[in-house]
Amino acid sequence: AGGKQILSDGPFSEVLRSAQEAIVVPPFVAIAVRPRPGVWEYVRVNVSELNVEQLTVSEYLHFKEELVDGKADDHYVLELDFEPFNESVPRPTRSSSIGNGVQFLNRHLSSSMFCNKDCLEPLLDFLRVHKHKGVVMMLNDRIQTIQRLQSALSKAEDYLIKLPADTPYSEFEFVIQGMGFERGWGDTAERVLEMMHLLLDILQAPDPSTLETFLGRLPMVFNVVILSVHGYFGQAHVLGLPDTGGQIVYILDQVRSLEHEMLQRIKKQGLDVTPRILIVSRLIPDAKGTTCNQRMEKVSGTEHASILRVPFRSEKGILRKWISRFDVWPYLETFTEDAAGEIIGELQGRPDLIIGNYSDGNIVASLLSHKMGVTQCNIAHALEKTKYPDSDIYWKRFEDKYHFSCQFSADLMAMNHADFIITSTYQEIAGTKNTVGQYESHKAFTFPGLYRVVHGIDVFDPKFNIVSPGADMAIYFPFSEKDVTCLTSLHRLIEQLLFKPEQNEEHIGVLDDTSKPIIFSMARLDRVKNITGLVECYGKNAKLRELANLVVVAGYNDVKKSNDREEIAEIEKMHRLIQEYNLRGQFRWIASQTNRVRNGELYRYICDKGGIFAQPAFYEAFGLTVVEAMTCGLPTFATCHGGPAEIIEDGVSGFHIDPYHADQAEKMTEFFVKCREDPNYWTKISAGGLLRIKERYTWQKYSERLMTLAGVYGFWKYVSKLERRETRRYLEMFYILKFRDLANSVPLATDEEPSTTDAVATFRGP
């Protein structure tokens, strides 16, 4: 007993508690130890001799490859290592600092300026070269040195302080121009003075907050390009189509909010500039009744934002049909070249900021940024590597259907090329104490027989920033605010959708007792979203079935309607579950709904019925539907794997559920029992969710933050251009020598109908 106690309290037990994986190749056991998020160590235990040795990353991955190849004798394997290029980049060391990159960077920059006044010179140079379409802004040639800048600022301060605060810039423009200042400081005397005070403070005693405020207010971003390549990118009748879901909603809401913020800032900067936002996506000639075959489409609710569509083409010509996001790789280089010409033509010059979305959009953003020398921001939405366990080491098993060697290589290049990366949650970057983050999983991995990644991405890199989005408040608002709208006129349509007994391609299943509250879920119908898992949990729980009905909005209910292999498998599974658990009378399956206004009212209608929203995904990077439901006041039960675990405070603003443990459906049962006993309990959880959204998840906060990040990282890109050049040369070499061949190995799609065998191909894990 004493020996066991010593073992359980000793260092080896700490190793076991922190172990993420173990590889057994007798007589050795190699263990990957993760004492805290972002920090990894590797050890190997000889079980026969009971000794322990520390391994390098390369040695551990070499040992791991033996699981696939047997005894690995190849000592000359291509290894990717980005660490040497990042030695000059400052980074935090505490796990709690991950995702707050801009704060750390501001501390570093202000500290450098404070300790060494020579570090102020890049700021002066940056302000002096600042132009938009050839027009000089901020400083002109009268100011050549820091001393001259300080003197001019003091002189301008003395002049401006005597003017009324609301004096328009035009009335004193020529006076301060003679001192060395151009447009961009502000639209009134008060705002110009405020900006000049910020710069004087930086020159005298720089601090992080002042530096961030100043850089964030600089007029730097007028033209933005947003890449979203795969799926059907449109504004109507697209949601629920293959590869078309939350990312589209995210970007359209982002663009509306971003344009509003840009217009406000440009006005306050005293500039007469028209901003432009281009969403660049794929043009699909066979558009299935959507607008995806139109080259240009104005974004509704905006003045200066458009969707620019560019087709996929090869030597065979333009590809007419949709193809899966897993099959786009051979088209992306040509797509990038074509898009570059279209972008420059539309904007009459280069953009100021390029934002990539998902793996394909991020690699295209990297190629465009590399070509144009523009600040690049990445948004992953979801990294597939964490969705499919062991998809790196057993990559060959996945390659024919998923081409993960291309996708993970593209992800790796894009995240190292980006100037800054936005995530919606901490977990997306570095996971939790017990789970590995999406980005963190790219720190070290191996493709046996292809290459090893010994240092892919460092989650402590200050390029990572958590900026959470919100829901469109014009569509998603609390159920208690219905008196401000006439949307209740939609209730007849909603009631038909939920309760009409007719069985057709839009809805199947009936609800016998329409007075019962509804468990509601809405998502794409694929394996990871796990809608069928929710249906199975419900089917197994007799008490829950007695207390509430289940309604899901997901995909098609007819396999003939879908060309997506995962969706087809899930459709077939759903039909099996309906029969197996005899769900008739308690379950309604509604096909995907693309009318967002009606969807918003649907959430509120479920509120009126005393229902809940369930989000059962195996993993959810963020959870936009969770935010939408909570914004409407609907109590929400969502996966504990990924973003929803941060959005929801368990038991306060909603509930966490673990989709890997079906018995957690009991949480929903307990909720409905409590609501029967205490009608105020539903209201309490609803109010908790609304408060959480108001505090953390709004598009206004998102856009303000994004514009500030663009300013700070634009300056950092200018300051650190020499260090970044080496990284980009390394990436360029990897792209040309390795990635191109991987992309070209993916078969080109055809416009012929897929065979039945291809259509029903499903995911098979190792």
From Swiss-Prot:
Keywords: Glycosyltransferase, Transferase. It catalyses: an NDP-alpha-D-glucose + D-fructose = a ribonucleoside 5'-diphosphate + sucrose + H(+). One of its GO terms (molecular function) is sucrose synthase activity. Its EC number is 2.4.1.13. Transmembrane segments: none annotated. Sucrose-cleaving enzyme that provides UDP-glucose and fructose for various metabolic pathways. Belongs to the glycosyltransferase 1 family. Plant sucrose synthase subfamily. This is Sucrose synthase. It comes from Beta vulgaris.
